[in-house]
């Protein structure tokens, strides 16, 4: 028997970042939107914990116990007095180290797959607790849809979305380390008073109404200057998307994937083609949002 779970990528339509906390994390007001790019995690009984991976960026995925999917299996097994003997196979379609929570998606997928395979019947609350221990974005990967994340992003309030939003994601050559981007944010903020992060009411209203034009006017990412400082060529990608008619262009999370909101599906296809023709990205992916969270297939 094996269990396969499909898990979406995410885009941050607002990422408001506070100053560094004593524990090194930052308080956030993080509005997540799950998008229709997916990884699939398959759990199969095995004699030991083993990770395999396929997909365009598979070579960049660690196959040892540092992999978040492996850590998820270990955490669930430890809570229930089990050995984490499972083969986790990741079919990877979410960009690696791209600011779209691909690793977090794999953790949420592995957690739900192992819970189903092992019959541990963890409550939603227990699964979310384990997710929060694994990383700030993992709880949202489990939940999907749209949500406001506070604290370091792990405390979620689900949000209403009144329609479908159409996105293009331009995948860069190379990755960005999330800790490095936060470190650059701290460096750029030195000597500056960083305000408390607060969710934008205009943005929440735009999501609830399904209004792409209003959402485009409200999107923001406080990590964008830091990501552009470390990866300056992303400015060219953002400009190419704007020139092609995107309603909004921003770095997705800590980058280096860039996200472009369009008016409709035809607009998304046109922006994707223009981005590819511009030579400013490795590939461009079209995806709608919102998308469901981790789902057993």
Swiss-Prot record:
Q: What does this protein do?
A: Catalyzes the phosphorylation of the position 2 hydroxy group of 4-diphosphocytidyl-2C-methyl-D-erythritol.
Q: Name one Pfam family in it.
A: GHMP_kinases_N
Catalytic function, reaction form: 4-CDP-2-C-methyl-D-erythritol + ATP = 4-CDP-2-C-methyl-D-erythritol 2-phosphate + ADP + H(+)
Among PANTHER family, the record links this protein to: 4-DIPHOSPHOCYTIDYL-2-C-METHYL-D-ERYTHRITOL KINASE, CHLOROPLASTIC
Keyword match Phosphoprotein: no
The record's annotation in InterPro entries points to: GHMP_kinase_C_dom, GHMP_kinase_C_sf, GHMP_kinase_N_dom, IspE, Ribosomal_Su5_D2-typ_SF, Ribsml_uS5_D2-typ_fold_subgr
Encoding gene per record: ispE
Q: In which pathway does it act?
A: Isoprenoid biosynthesis; isopentenyl diphosphate biosynthesis via DXP pathway; isopentenyl diphosphate from 1-deoxy-D-xylulose 5-phosphate: step 3/6
NCBIfam families this protein is in? ispE (TIGR00154), PRK03188.1 (NF002870)
Record family assignment: Belongs to the GHMP kinase family. IspE subfamily.
- Its Enzyme Commission number(s) read 2.7.1.148
Residues of the active site: 10, 137
Keyword annotations: ATP-binding, Isoprene biosynthesis, Kinase, Nucleotide-binding, Transferase
Name recorded for this polypeptide: 4-diphosphocytidyl-2-C-methyl-D-erythritol kinase
Report the superkingdom from the record.
Bacteria
What residues does ATP bind to?
A: 95-105
Could you provide one GO biological process annotation from this protein's UniProt record?
isopentenyl diphosphate biosynthetic process, methylerythritol 4-phosphate pathway
Tell me yes or no: is Nucleotide-binding among this UniProt entry's keywords.
yes
Q: Please give the Gene Ontology molecular function terms for this protein.
A: 4-(cytidine 5'-diphospho)-2-C-methyl-D-erythritol kinase activity; ATP binding
């Amino acid at each position: 028997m094996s269990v396969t779970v499909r898990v979406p990528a995410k885009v941050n339509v607002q990422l408001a970042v506070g100053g560094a906390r004593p524990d090194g994390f930052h308080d956030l007001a993080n509005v997540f939107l799950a998008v229709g790019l997916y990884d699939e995690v398959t759990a199969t009984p095995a004699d030991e914990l083993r990770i395999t991976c396929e997909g365009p960026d598979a070579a960049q995925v660690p196959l040892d116990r540092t992999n978040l999917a492996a850590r998820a299996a270990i955490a669930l097994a430890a809570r229930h007095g089990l050995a984490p003997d499972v083969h986790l196979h990741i079919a990877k379609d979410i960009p690696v180290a791209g600011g779209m929570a691909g690793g977090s998606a794999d953790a949420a997928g592995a957690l739900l797959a192992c819970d189903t395979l092992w019959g541990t019947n963890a409550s939603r609350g227990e699964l979310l607790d384990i997710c929060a221990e694994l990383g700030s974005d993992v709880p949202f990967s489990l939940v999907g849809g749209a949500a406001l994340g506070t604290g370091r992003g792990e405390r979620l309030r689900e949000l209403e979305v009144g329609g479908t939003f159409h996105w293009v994601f331009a995948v860069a050559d190379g990755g960005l380390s999330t800790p490095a981007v936060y470190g650059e944010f701290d460096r750029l903020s030195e000597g500056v008073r960083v305000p408390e992060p607060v969710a934008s009411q205009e943005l929440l209203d735009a999501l609830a109404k399904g209004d792409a034009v209003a959402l485009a006017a409200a999107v923001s990412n406080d990590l964008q200057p830091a990501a552009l400082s470390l990866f300056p060529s992303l400015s060219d990608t953002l400009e190419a998307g704007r020139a092609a008619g995107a309603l909004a262009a921003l770095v997705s999370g800590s980058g280096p994937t860039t996200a472009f909101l369009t008016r409709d599906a035809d607009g998304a296809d046109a922006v994707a083609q223009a981005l590819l023709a511009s030579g400013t990205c490795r590939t461009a992916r079209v995806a709608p949002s919102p998308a469901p969270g981790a789902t057993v297939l």
